[in-house]
Amino acid sequence: SIDFIDHFRQPGEEFDYNWEERWIRDEGFLKIVPKAINDLFDKTDIDGSEIDHFIIPSVFPRVDQMIAKKCGIDPDKVVGNMALTVGNTGSAHSLLMLASVLERAKPGEKILVCSFGNGSDAILFETTDNIKNFKPHQTIENLIEAGVEENNYLKYLTFNDLVKWEKGMRGEQDRKTALTTLYRHND
């Protein structure tokens, strides 16, 4: 466990405070993630050359390739991060990439899924013969192609609480205890 805080939000602040990107890349991604991967390799008794698909979402260009090189993973095994089509989906991003890989994976393939954010996680999967029976109802590619692009900037600002808006009487947060509910559950 490494206490590495790359961004934070002070109580009462509307936005996160991010540290310098170069520091996050060099001290975070390029030191912490390879350590997590190599620790996993030690525990599972495999090495980077055995990885068929390497998943590591990153907003930094080429960082995925640099991590692969540090861990002995063939750079051709790095999975594209889909950033140009879906942006940065946050904590769901590595799972979105995993779903995309599982749609084309073959039996016996090793899939390394990593994430970074205030530390790092590394998980190793190996597909079985059952992967041949996996037929998704919708592929990730089809979902992206059929997606609806949101071009209403005011809606974006509202959904991300970047503008104040009137929510109406029902939208107000009630911080009082509902006395009727409290009474009903008193025994």
Language model segments and positions:
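Phosphate/pyrophosphate-binding loops at sites that engage ATP/ADP/AMP, CoA/4′-phosphopantetheine
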Residues: 34-52, 71-74, 104-105
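Glycine-rich phosphate-binding loops at beta-strand->alpha-helix junctions
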Residues: 54-66
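Cysteine-centered iron-sulfur cluster-binding motifs in ferredoxin-type domains/subunits
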Residues: 186-187
